[in-house]
Amino acid sequence: MSDTLPLLLRAARGEAVERPPVWMMRQAGRYMKIYRDLRDKYPSFRERSENPDLSYEISMQPFNAFKPDGVILFSDILTPLPGMGIDFDIIESKGPQIGDPIRTMAQVDALHPLNPAESMPFVGEVLGRLRQSVGNEAAVLGFVGAPWTLAAYVVEGKSSKNYAVIKAMAFQEPALLHKLLDHFAESIAQYLRYQIDSGAQVVQMFDSWAGQLSPADYDTFAAPYQKKVVDLVKQTHPDTPFILYISGSAGVLERMATTGVDIISLDWTVDMAEALARLPEHIGVQGNVDPGLLFGTPEAIEARIDDCVRKARGRKHILNLGHGILPGTPEENGASFFRSGKSVMDRIGALA
C-alpha cells in the first residue's frame, strides 16, 4: 500500500496526504553543534563529503535530532567535477575554488564524460545506507547542480557577485558556453540516474545562479539545459519526483514550469499565493519560509509556517525554507521549524 511509503514521496507524487511534509535545505550543517564538532575534527570539506562514513553520519545528524520528512545526501553540487577532469576545493569562509577555470574550447573538449559509479562510488554507498537507516520514516533525497550554475563556478573559478566572466563568455563566445552547458547536462543526468539507482527517491536540481540571468538569457542559457537534464532522467526514471530550485526566481517562475519538473522550490521573495496563481495546477511547490526568520521567535516561525501552508492548501506542497538554513541560526529555532511544521494542521485545521 502506498501509505506505507514515506510522506514526502507520497506528497511529491501528488497523493493526498495528512499534512505537508517538511525538510530544510542545508539541514545538515553549521547551525548544528554536532556538525561543528565533526568539522573541527575533519576540517576538509571534501573529506567530510567524500568519505562515506562521514557523509552518512552528517546526513543523519538532522534526522536523528529533528526527524524531518526528508533526509538529503550531505554532498556538494561541485562533487561530480573531478570525475569530468575539473579539480576543485571548498575553503572554509571563502567557498569553492576551481583549480583551472575553464575559458577555452580546448578545455571543454578535454572534459571527460561522467561515470558516477567510477568517480563517486561514495555517493551511491551513502544513499544506500540512508535508505536502509530511515526506511519509510523519511524520503531520501538526492541532488545536483544545474548546468548553468556549474558553468558559472567553473568559468568564474569561484563564487562571484556579478558573473562578469561567464556573461562575457555568453555574449562573446556563446558556442563555447553552449558546448560546456551541454556537456554538463549529459553528465548531470547520468549522475541523477546513478543517485536514483542507489537509493534517492526524490531529486532536486539547484540552479542557484540562474536568478542572475535576464528572462531572455534564462531562456537561452539555463532553461534548455535544465529541460535536457529532466528529459534524460525522466526517460529512465519517469516516476521519480523532480524538484527545481532557483534563488531569485520570481521573474522566471512560469518559465521554470516549462522544463518538465514536477515541483518548483520557491525562494521567500515571492508570496506563496501569488506564486501558485502564476503556476499551472499540475506543478507542485516547495518552500518558502525566509531562513532569516529562524533568527526570530518560535511564535514568529510558527505564524509564518501557518501562513505559508494555508496559502498552499489544495496544491502539492512540501514545506521548506526559501533557501538553505543560515550558519549561526540558533539550533533550537531549527528544531522549532520542524516541530511547528509537523503540527501545522493542529493549528490551521484540516478544512479551514
Curated annotation (Swiss-Prot):
The record marks 76 as: Transition state stabilizer. PROSITE patterns: UROD_1 (PS00906), UROD_2 (PS00907). One of its GO terms (cellular component) is cytoplasm. One of its GO terms (molecular function) is uroporphyrinogen decarboxylase activity. The gene is hemE. Belongs to the uroporphyrinogen decarboxylase family. Substrate binds at residues 26-30, 76, 153, 208, 323. InterPro entries: UROD/MetE-like_sf, Uroporphyrinogen_deCO2ase_HemE, Uroporphyrinogen_deCOase. Catalyzes the decarboxylation of four acetate groups of uroporphyrinogen-III to yield coproporphyrinogen-III. Its main location: cytoplasm. It catalyses: uroporphyrinogen III + 4 H(+) = coproporphyrinogen III + 4 CO2. It is found in: Cytoplasm. Pathway: Porphyrin-containing compound metabolism; protoporphyrin-IX biosynthesis; coproporphyrinogen-III from 5-aminolevulinate: step 4/4. GO terms for biological process: protoporphyrinogen IX biosynthetic process. Pfam families: URO-D. This is Uroporphyrinogen decarboxylase. Coiled coil: none annotated. It is an enzyme of class 4 (lyase). Keywords: Cytoplasm, Decarboxylase, Lyase, Porphyrin biosynthesis. Homodimer. Its EC number is 4.1.1.37. SUPFAM superfamilies: UROD/MetE-like.
